[in-house]
């Protein structure tokens, strides 16, 4: 080893020792012909004193050095309480430049704001800053904590293929040409879903993997085309068994940041979550639940409220908003695909004003504040129309109100299981939300096609009412994991495919290997996958998952560091068989 001691480990008890350190010049100060250098490396920072001006003259920020010298106690009054090494310094008698540094594109400092594009282009420099550096170290601890829990429960860590066949799972695949079979293609997996089910058929019983997954999605804020999930699958289990293991993992992870997660975690049905919060991932760090006003306005003359659903959410103190701000709410709603956001203002004397107040009856006005829980000085926002989009608009408004009115307790951790989700949803709803609907019928899977229905015998009689053994874990309004009890019978899987418009021939072509496996005594099984990037971002206290990924992509999947994706040469294109046709064309996929 070049170094004999970690710089950040030096303390008063090391005074008098001769040590060799190695690291980077984080900062330099000159005083009376003496150079004081903050030497930074993974363990921390220590001050190095260089009295030889000729040696110190050429040293600049981020030079990589090896320093040999004696550990001495700092003079009284010169201690630095902000450094763990602040009682001591190293007086150098030998300095070796291991590598010089060119002028920096930005300062290596946690106190200077740098544009994300520059940070990602020079990510290797960005990671020298303590914030990004600590985030990756936290990620490593998170990995270990999860492994420790699962190892105690006799789980087996197994790697599944990253070159497989294209099997629709709800998003577009990244495709890889197979050079040895021109015209044929591998796909990078969107998840290990089918392989982990096959491992249950294989008798592994308890599997996990910190898995890389790939989805070729349209650009969405804070999404990555390649991401990581903690993937877990268990045989001979029911929903409660999976949730108990998942909660044990969460307890271990949040303990890393000093928080005790109280278990068992609360549960709420999907239907209740949508009714009360307008979303299946509610943030429970604030109140302001949605209020159903459909029955209240059942006989209203106001045509806008003559709808299948009328709902409201209250903005505390919102009546004092100027007209310009109220108009801005309309634009906010239109950006979300709505026509606007109706409102009434509850004045200090209880009188209702605003556009809606002029269109409803005196009787409706008289009891509206009480019905919605509004107080004098509040604003009541409304949405009317089909239940799902109207609730979604109010749910988004609720969160926006929480942010604008400081209603969210930023220091709190709020966990919730959302259970009993629908098995199917209208295909039009899935495509409208940006998902790739699997199948060709009016119905597609809410989670994926391998989720077990709760009513195995009767789910296909009324697909729109069928419930799934599916569960999502929500933390502070973020979905951080989701899973289900899986289908383990060939006949049930075929019936689910049929509801989705996948006939037997297509099912065999795309999923024949899974259906074949189900013929050989497949055990009941279920599992969960945690969104690892999101969890680490929450634990690190950062807004973006890009901050906890070593080399993330920017918007649209572009990598500023390597300039990927990039064109390939004509020779590469020919060799890979990109334009070749397979010997036998496959039917078009959904």
UniProtKB/Swiss-Prot annotation:
Q: What is its main location?
A: cytoplasm
NCBIfam families (alphabetical):
aspS_bact (TIGR00459), PRK00476.1 (NF001750)
Q: Where is this region: Disordered?
A: 556-590
Q: Which PANTHER family match?
A: ASPARTATE--TRNA LIGASE, MITOCHONDRIAL, ASPARTYL/LYSYL-TRNA SYNTHETASE
- Belongs to which family? Belongs to the class-II aminoacyl-tRNA synthetase family. Type 1 subfamily.
Site keyed Important for tRNA non-discrimination: positions: 31, 77
GO terms, molecular function: aspartate-tRNA ligase activity; aspartate-tRNA(Asn) ligase activity; ATP binding; nucleic acid binding
Might you give the EC number(s) for this enzyme? 6.1.1.23
Going by the record, the broad EC class of this enzyme is ligase
What residues bind ATP, as annotated? 215-217, 224, 479, 531-534
What is known about its subunit structure? Homodimer.
Please give the residue ranges the record annotates as the region Aspartate. Answer: 193-196
Single GO cellular component annotation? Answer: cytoplasm
Protein task: Aspartyl-tRNA synthetase with relaxed tRNA specificity since it is able to aspartylate not only its cognate tRNA(Asp) but also tRNA(Asn). Reaction proceeds in two steps: L-aspartate is first activated by ATP to form Asp-AMP and then transferred to the acceptor end of tRNA(Asp/Asn).
SUPFAM superfamilies tied to this protein: Class II aaRS and biotin synthetases (SSF55681), GAD domain-like (SSF55261), Nucleic acid-binding proteins (SSF50249)
Print the organism lineage: Bacteria, Bacillati, Actinomycetota, Actinomycetes, Propionibacteriales
- Localization: Cytoplasm
**UniProt keyword terms in alphabetical order:** Aminoacyl-tRNA synthetase, ATP-binding, Cytoplasm, Ligase, Nucleotide-binding, Protein biosynthesis
Q: What is this protein called?
A: Aspartate--tRNA(Asp/Asn) ligase
